[in-house]
Amino acid sequence: NGLLVLPEDARVGADVKPILGMDDWIFDIAITANRPDCQCIYGMAREVAAVLGKELKEPALDYTADDVKKENFKVSVLAQDICPRYTAHYVHDVKISESPAWMRKRLALVGIGSISNVVDITNFILKELGQPMHAFDYSYLEGEEIVVRRANDGEKIVTLDEKEFELNSNNLVICDGKKAVALAGIMGGLNSEINDGTTEVMFESAKFARDNIRKSSRALGQASDSVSYTHLTLPTKLEV
């Protein structure tokens, strides 16, 4: 209803920022083209640690492999010249909900609105590690496979922002067994969007050729946060 409920002990006239947990610092840093590794929080933290001679706190990257396996599912990359690496991880028993307050706050501080717990995870990783990701609703993926290929001339896709694009062989697409489900490195397709009823998710993390993604983005007039990260060359440790 648009009302903000404050704690009962909130004092009239007091600064509201500490009450809302907003008494924080935001660094607005202009990154030059030769330092894409500083485009994310991890990269910037590494740089600051080196300058100050401090120990870098590595992010926790451990997970249980059994939680992300899907039997009989396969990934085929038919355009390795513009997609040298593609990984897909399956997660089941998912419940779409609101992200925890701390994650919503951190995303808001970097200008990203919260959508859902699953989508917010991909955006959080983008800003923390500089790795673009995408999440597909697995129930909409046909044929139990992901195929990374060049688009067919005249092939069409409707992206998450409900825009339809006619593609050609210069465009890289992510497909299931029958159809295109994402514009690689640019935006996912509406036909596999995460929704409130999603219970199975396929997470994508990949390395795409920056020149191809940049040219496709410009030719189609379709930009996104993923494009701004994909078209930069990142150190191997920060990829995928």
Role assignments for model-derived ranges:
Residues N1-L234, L238:
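RNA/tRNA-interacting regions in translation and RNA-turnover enzymes
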